[in-house]
Amino acid sequence: MNAFVVWLESTTLSRGIVHYRWIWPLCEIIHFIGLTLVVGIAGFFDLRLMGFMKRVPVSAARDLMPLAMAGFLMNLVTGAAFFIGTPHQYVGNVAFWAKVFFLLLAGLNAMFFETTVGARTINLGAGDETPRSAKVVGAVSLLSWLGVLYWGRMLPYIGNAF
């Protein structure tokens, strides 16, 4: 892994991210906006799946998901920029790997939802009860995104401090 880190830090892209002082703060702003979209919308949808806000049809909550995906793409690009800029601060940081774990868990949970539970819940209207499996998926998703938030916030304080 060290050879990869050394190579990545020697690239023009990595040096540019660190050298141009406006890139990092701009990426942080975009990352925060993206995270707000992802966690806000996914959290709203997850809470509906868990049985809260029953006055909202599941399809109405799901209609916001393209915005959540846009936020996720914003985070993917800016997160990659953070990693490329200073990979040595991430590869040995337990908080980074915990964040990656929760991101993967959220993704696998979303795939599980789409391939199993989603078809049974998408047409639920206002007042309809969601199946227990949907409630579990919603809870796992919400906890996954909270894990992403927590471990992402802990990055500067745990492991290789920034």
For each feature predicted by the language model, list its residue ranges.
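Polytopic transmembrane helical bundles with strong interfacial aromatic enrichment
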Residues: 1-162
